[in-house]
């Protein structure tokens, strides 16, 4: 693995992506990451037996293993001695299936079978990529109407390491994919300022699901409630924390035109419109 150490020392990169990881032996990935994590700080002095000093660096690695079964993905991760993460392909397929089901998808199963839920510390979550996009070699495109919902899942939950697709952010004119920059910027700001604290899941309905984050003391006014629907929409009673009792929350996505009051138990009746996404934070808080 001398070449791997040379490459790391020359480029000083801090991570690697292994394309088609299913064709790369797990032992190779393990040895490669271990080699690039400890790079000689200086060459061995000529004519001496003095060993070179090594500098340790935390190298991030992710494998692109296009398989819907988390058992295969976790097996590969384990075989690398947990040196690599994996793209959450099962979650992507859930997004795709929900987006093309015309309201017939069971939203309670949206996270079922995903790395996000099964091995969150090793899950690199994504919505689409260069292979799943329209015209891609593994086309399984997540329809545009569902993109806000899918990105809310990977950006506003505590599990997973989210990855944004440049094709969604900037658009792909060649295949008539419009930019989602405005809504993605809003979700990124929500992640940075408000998506903190204990999480409570409400994936208990076929059409309307959601979760809340209670916030923490380190991030002023943090905490939020997310509710989404692939059907006619509706309301969902969710617990956001007793510390918010009496506070008014507003939907920063602009889909609900009214604010709600959190009750004495720390719960609110959070609304979402048809095939929509609503993200509720304390009223008058800014992005």
Question: Model-flagged regions — what are they?
Answer:
Residues 2-287:
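Active-site-proximal helices and loops of the catalytic beta/alpha 8
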